Amino acid sequence: MWKNIRVACLLLVLLIVVINAYRDQNQDWNQPINILLHPINADGLPTTEKYIQQLQQNDFAEVKQYLEKNSQQYRGQSSYFMIQMGRELDQTPPKMSEQPSILNNILWSLKFRYYAWKQHESIDGSPSLTLYLNYYDPKNTKELKHSTALERGRIGSVNLFAAHKQERQNNVVLVHELLHGFGATDKYNLANGEPLFPIGYAQYDKRPLYPQTEAEIMGGRIPLSEDKSKMPNDLEQTVISLLTAKEIGWVQ
């Protein structure tokens, strides 16, 4: 019985997804873009909770400025981004399967949409995109698992460190997933995380090619050699490439 109820709920979410698919793939960049952020104490630690309680909307001002600056560059006029701090949530989004497959990915996608539907309250309004920020104390969690986002559904699950010294690097991860939500694709090798040449390079025509000094935002890392790279320290060390701008609709 409970299995049938769960299947029915997932089918309902799938129907909603189909109805909203057209809207989600046709973002009007002339309208204000409202990004809703829901912080989550993902490791349940008091130190993480203390960090979340100190978070302010202004902590994400760099994200807003970065997006507006780059939209101005490609569109000839700036899109207006509103970064809204939402409610802290108790439940983390569903995690992707450790054994990826087409079926597992589809099931995870439906579960994630169902999670987002259950978490939404009227006070949240109708955001253009919702990101669930899963915070972890870096003293307890040394390495974060891969963040994910869905264009069809305009939702993302972003894993971040609960530390002020990590905030600018957190913003790099946040913008990467945010752009995923608007249709940008990964530009790195999924097997090893290294940026793909040339689409994952910010300076693909640089001579000598290495070391690079910037990261393409969807490439994720700064290439130092053919098989070595590093995480950018902040958004100032990243660029949005023409290809990424086309994918999200800033360039026709």
Report the location of each language-model feature:
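Metalloprotease/metallohydrolase-associated module, dominated by Zn2+-dependent proteases
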Residues: 1-5, 10-17, 147-151, 156, ...
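Propeptide-to-catalytic entry region of secreted or membrane-anchored zinc metalloproteases
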Residues: 2-10, 15-124, 135
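A mature extracytoplasmic/lumenal domain signature
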Residues: 39-41, 135-137, 162, 186, ...
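Short, solvent-exposed loop/turn elements at domain surfaces
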Residues: 44-50, 140-141, 225-229
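Extracytoplasmic/periplasmic, Sec-exported soluble proteins
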Residues: 47-59, 150, 162-171, 210
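Stable alpha-helical elements in mature extracytoplasmic
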Residues: 59, 63, 170-174, 231
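Acidic/His-rich structured neighborhood in mature extracellular/periplasmic domains
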Residues: 88-172, 189, 193
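Active-site recognition of the HExxH zinc-binding catalytic motif
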Residues: 169-187
